[in-house]
Amino acid sequence: MASTGSQASDIDEIFGFFSDGAPPTKKPRKLLPSLKTKKPRELVLVIGTGISAAVAPQVPALKSWKGLIQALLDAAIDFDLLEDEESKKFQKCLHEDKNLVHVAHDLIQKLSPRTSNVRSTFFKDCLYEVFDDLESKMEDSGKQLLQSVLHLMENGALVLTTNFDNLLELYAADQGKQLESLDLTDEKKVLEWAQEKRKLSVLHIHGVYTNPSGIVLHPAGYQNVLRNTEVMREIQKLYENKSFLFLGCGWTVDDTTFQALFLEAVKHKSDLEHFMLVRRGDVDEFKKLRENMLDKGIKVISYGNDYADLPEYFKRLTCEISTRGRSGMVREGQLNGSSAAHSEIRGCST
């Protein structure tokens, strides 16, 4: 006997398919209560290489330290700035995974004048070559991530990054928003950022490629900030009083710059509550990371099994946090199920 339309629909639902044959929507990860109840102004977003790699995956220099150094080396070779023996030496160090900070430092020294009194440097040319035309290399899913970050910034969240690129600033400019790039060479502005007087500024703790003189690879490069007790006190107060949300960071807390700024002088570590969004991936690695980070006051949260799950997860989280920041407590279900609730927040429409 022929099935009615209603019966066919029931059968499709039982077998997990819609009438057009498409698989059902994957059930989204639930949002952690202790994170989703935060307000934007209670957060400091920490942007790592994973975000830049997701925004512009075709740019190898954005994916890792090693990728960046290789790209700088390739640029130096293309510009005929290194002798054959020198380029072979650098390639060998990269291939053998020697200390990448030292390799990068040596390469920068090779491309820079022997005296700090001279502004002219080939390093700047290589940086601009590596990060050339980033705007055209952004992918839509990556832009969704930047949109969420920008929205939280506009609602009071602070943003710092370990990345040298200015993808967030470029995206904001495309949206008609002006963000300022800060680095650790400007103590006055860093202090104002930490005091929440420059909320639409992005603090690049390693520097940003548009200001090569501000790029630092190890603590010796920013002694001016470390010696400034007022700046350091304000920076460390952020880590003690706000919740840091690590995005695309992996092992950022092991970064020497991050440790010197936020971890080494922080007292009362038992009071900390920070968060790290990561892909679940390998179960053993995930478990190890979660245990290690929890000892540091950081809750590791899985946004899904695939990198592609992050934009949608972070968008839902942004909508929830931003709505709470505006109107107090709301139920997650209201946001997940109500297009009206989403549409109140720019960039959160379904």
Curated annotation (Swiss-Prot):
Query: What's the chief localization of this chain?
Result: nucleus
Domain of life per record = Eukaryota
Keywords, ordered alphabetically: Acetylation, Nucleus, Phosphoprotein
Tell me a GO cellular component. Cajal body
Compartment(s) of residence = Nucleus, Cajal body
Phosphoserine carried by residues? S9
Q: Which Pfam families match?
A: SIR2_2
* Positions bearing N-acetylalanine: A2
Free-text function comment from the UniProt entry:
May play a role in Cajal bodies formation.
Q: Which family does it belong to?
A: Belongs to the FAM118 family.
What is the name of this protein? Protein FAM118B
In its UniProt entry, the species of origin is given as Macaca fascicularis
Q: What is the lineage of its organism?
A: Eukaryota, Metazoa, Chordata, Craniata, Vertebrata
